[in-house]
Amino acid sequence: LINVIAGNSSEDLAKKISKKLKANLIKSELKIFPDGESKITLKGKFVRGKTIVVQSIYPPVDSNLIQALALISKAKEYSSEVIIVVPYLGYARQDREFLPGEIVTMKVIGKLLKGAGATRIIVTDIHSKIGLQQLGLKSKNVSAIPELVKYFKKLKLENPLVVSPDQGGKGRANEFAKVFKLDFIALQKVRDRKTGKVKIKNQKISEVRDRDLILVDDMISTGGSIVKATEFLKKQKCRRVFVTCTHALLINDAEKKIKKAGVTRIISTNSIPGKTSVVDISNIIAKAIK
């Protein structure tokens, strides 16, 4: 028998996972006090067996992390095996010491999850495989690419081409293109480590002309890279630009900025719930748990 605890950040996704596993769903009620503290009350009874905690760690990252730890800790009182499902794992970009004195927060997160009682972690399209190793926990990284491609196949696209906004995302765009049986290209971007400013290095790309483009990324935060890439591609006389990612954080008015740059649509998964999260990953997560 399996228990699934629905964390506040992933309520809907947890319900779907629970249904697919025919599990015992335990809901959680969250109360935030005026001083910012959170208090969680679980609603439901535990059955004997392993427990899955589903809690995505997106903004407010620290609150969602503390809540995940609290849920794991409670689950551990009833189950010896506690699997934490964190579709979007905040801090995944802090996976190494880029500048002297920086703290590799992923190592800290690993200690916290283990200390709370997690025996295994399941994530979706983590930003860096190195980060996953830093956790020091038994882990599984599930790819949402097949699910995203399935969705795009239903759209009527005109001679589509897959584009990576930078060289770093080449592998991901290549995988997306392979599953979709399409070609792909990668732009070259330079980011200033100190200011975070981004610019595109390419001069001209002829193969995008009059084609629908699918810009593929693992996550979109402020949308800076996507905006720069879209503006560049629009200048090259492409047709429409679609943006897809697993995790759409879309901080502040990122969505507005991206649309203003000329993007037709943003399509993301429900690792982070929102307007763009039309692709469901409960299936692939349920498979990973089994």
How does the language model describe each region?
Residues 1-290:
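PRPP-associated nucleotide enzymes
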